[in-house]
Design a protein with these regions (language model features):
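N-terminal core-binding DNA-recognition domain of tyrosine recombinases/integrases
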Residues: 3-18, 24-87
Length: 87
């Protein structure tokens, strides 16, 4: 599903290659935090507490608020895409 999302933002939304790469990196980091391979991503197993825990972990790891915001934006965009697919 994540690959499909990245293809969508690259082709349909015409995001820059750099943005697509960064979103891919952000979503891989999200999956790693969850302990999943990127291919194992299952949005139905997640909730807001998972996102909040990831955000707090990133801040504790010393990431800037700007970086955290961008990573959360990638996750939010992915979920918006999945909702549009009816998932």
């Amino acid at each position: 599903m994540i690959k499909r999302f990245l293809d969508y933002i690259a082709i349909e939304k015409r995001y820059s290659p750099r943005t697509v790469k960064e979103y891919g990196d952000d979503l891989r980091a999200w999956c790693a935090f969850l302990g999943w391979d990127i291919e194992d991503f299952d949005p139905k197993q997640l909730d807001a507490e998972d996102v909040k825990a990831w955000m707090l972990q990133m801040l504790e790891d010393g990431q800037s608020p700007r970086s955290v915001k961008r990573r959360l934006s990638a996750v939010k965009s992915l979920y918006r895409f999945l909702l549009g697919l009816g998932l």
